[in-house]
Amino acid sequence: MQTKDGHLPKNLGDKVLLVAASHTGNNIFCTPAIRFLKKHYPNTIFDLVALNQKSAEVFYGNNDVSTLFITDKKHKLTKLAKNYSTVICLYYKSVDVVSGIEKNLASVPPLVSGVHHADQVLNFVADYTGHELTEVDRAYVIGNGSTTNSSPIANADIGNDDILICMHLGCARTAIHGWKFFYRHKTMHQKLWPIDSYIELANQLIRANSRIRFVITGTRHEAFLGKRFEKSVPGTINLIGKTSIPELFKLMRDMNLFISQDCGVLHVASASGVPLLGLFGPTNPANTGPYPMKKNHIAIKKESMAAINPTEVVAAALRLLDDFPKTRVLESLGSH
């Protein structure tokens, strides 16, 4: 088989080691490229290194990956790489941990603005291997890595007519550092929408439609945000600290809408097909927005997060709920 320019595709060998990133979103950006590699090299073993435990959850149950390793130690990765014919670093900031590898190493270059990060990784592996991309290749892949078949809200008291909106209130920094980071740096962190704005948004939506209920997610370090939201918004289902990435993916299938700022869970939602409303300040949705952009996705972009008005978000949310209604099957949630 020849490539479109008449050359033979690159021979990767029998075993390839892929090196991903340390953040959930950046690892999700790698998944279309991994699927592309497995599609074109079905007999090659692709093992993968994620740099920490939480971001590794992206790859749980991913059938394109044979073995998942978790380490950010350069010496361990250098030793591991000796067992592989090719090593491909899928995230440019992970290049430091692969710098000890002396041969058969390829790495995604620094990312540029104006092109989605997932597309840049995908374009790199397509060019590197010599295989042609199609539109079908532009899709995230999140595996069924959940240990249970039930929904994360299976035991919640949910009515037949409830409209469920999932919101993720934090970001990568609050997920790791919790309230100390939030209260010391909340005015400096450019990706965060103020918690008071989320609360105002929620209560405006409930006033617009009393059937609306909110499901909030996050890591255990973000429990302080959940308590504040739950206290101010009646009927909230608080799942903060209770879900893995595969469970979040499963949760999205039960939601009518997902709303958040630019964060890893936004990309989980993007992979799931749920109607999605993303809030962007200085970060560019062309780089890190929903992927690929669909009719049931809206990205609100302002110069700063503080410039995003809850009333504008309410209007966009109600439009998505009207345009993409969902019929919930309560069997999967538990009947009440």
Give the predicted meaning of each segment.
Residues 1-336:
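Catalytic machinery of carbohydrate-active enzymes
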